[in-house]
Curated annotation (Swiss-Prot):
PANTHER family: KRAB-RELATED DOMAIN-CONTAINING PROTEIN, SYNOVIAL SARCOMA, X MEMBER
Catalytic reaction annotation: N(6),N(6)-dimethyl-L-lysyl(4)-[histone H3] + S-adenosyl-L-methionine = N(6),N(6),N(6)-trimethyl-L-lysyl(4)-[histone H3] + S-adenosyl-L-homocysteine + H(+)
Gene3D superfamilies for this protein: 6.10.140.140, SET domain
Compositional bias (Polar residues): 135-150
Job description of the protein: Histone methyltransferase that selectively methylates 'Lys-4' of dimethylated histone H3 (H3K4me2) to produce trimethylated 'Lys-4' histone H3 (H3K4me3). May play a role in epigenetic regulation of gene expression by defining an active chromatin state.
Lineage: Eukaryota, Metazoa, Chordata, Craniata, Vertebrata
Gene name of the encoded protein: PRDM7
Protein name as annotated: Histone-lysine N-methyltransferase PRDM7
Amino acid sequence: MSPERSQEESPEGDTERTERKPMVKDAFKDISIYFTKEEWAEMGDWEKTRYRNVKMNYNALITVGLRATRPAFMCHRRQAIKLQVDDTEDSDEEWTPRQQVKPPWMAFRGEQSKHQKGMPKASFNNESSLRELSGTPNLLNTSDSEQAQKPVSPPGEASTSGQHSRLKLELRRKETEGKMYSLRERKGHAYKEISEPQDDDYLYCEMCQNFFIDSCAAHGPPTFVKDSAVDKGHPNRSALSLPPGLRIGPSGIPQAGLGVWNEASDLPLGLHFGPYEGRITEDEEAANSGYSWLITKGRNCYEYVDGKDKSSANWMRYVNCARDDEEQNLVAFQYHRQIFYRTCRVIRPGCELLVWSGDEYGQELGIRSSIEPAESLGQAVNCWSGMGMSMARNWASSGAASGRKSSWQGENQSQRSIHVPHAVWPFQVKNFSVNMWNAITPLRTSQDHLQENFSNQRIPAQGIRIRSGNILIHAAVMTKPKVKRSKKGPNS
């Protein structure tokens, strides 16, 4: 090719290049309205081309009727233009709820624009960052194609009030951050099935003579006296666990061994002591130790708490059984599968603590029964009830059997591990309430005859078998009981 020809053709090439530049500017005109002058000046041609292609794809999807997400750069500029329109206080535009909504992408886009301004021009060469910017998700519903065709202000007007709009955008962004919340920060809720109270979940108020759970409506929560802290395994733990104000000394009952005495001040009505501590076992032999209580875990399911071992028991093992109603000042009952003692009358200083779970307690609850005393050996009554206000009263107040009103005659008959033979059940009980538990079961016996001893021993209360819910359980009815001497010595 000759140099003359190349010189002739070069002017034509220059004219073509000059014509392409305005065409390129016109091609990016619809993109430039979404950016400020500063952003547009810093942007390279390949970025402009990419934004133009993104907008063309978006418009194509809207045209064919598909739902498409508006590109992030279009949303940002559109919001800035809307903010300028909202600044006019005297606008006659009709109010709609949608205009007052603060889209959640405002905060994100505001931070993104700041990041874009602060980034050097070389950082835009990273294609992955542009993908992230263009692919930013937003929550605005853009199915309405009319929104994309709304007229917008020219970029010159937007740049003049750009600083003011940014300040207002920053304020609204802070408001949006305060209102937005994360689903992961929701408070968790734990649900559990509500179970009905069990028969040993109830306590009894001696003052208003009514059952309650946790707290009496009239007199408040009950008072529990705590034992003195002593580690299990200490050889004299049972005596050292005695609460302040009480004393262990010789019992006032003739030849009954040691007992527990009140030495400080009056013990008020309804004061609770416990729980009774000892070795937990299901062995039937524990009933013969003289220091065990029978605890009901469920229907035909029992266990013993045996306080014979002084290193595992507490001071309650020394509490003796009352001989009659006048002596009784404590009531034994089961609460949450443990044995507790409750004062049924005020205990003055110098008085011995004597416990029983018999008919005195039944009379206080208004227990009634149509049962007459049995006439022969081997008949007994298994009398208990649930939480009703009208209950069955043990007829043993006649003194025929339980030993509380039996003649002691100086022989000091002991109530150790009473084993009742064949119980007569069921029996007719009048005036049972609707809430009464249907838990009348035969007595569990391990011997064919009643065993008692009348040696010179204490009168432990632990031989009495009780059931939960403050209710008397086993009351043996005997005539002319046979007794056997025990080889056990006095209580120590």
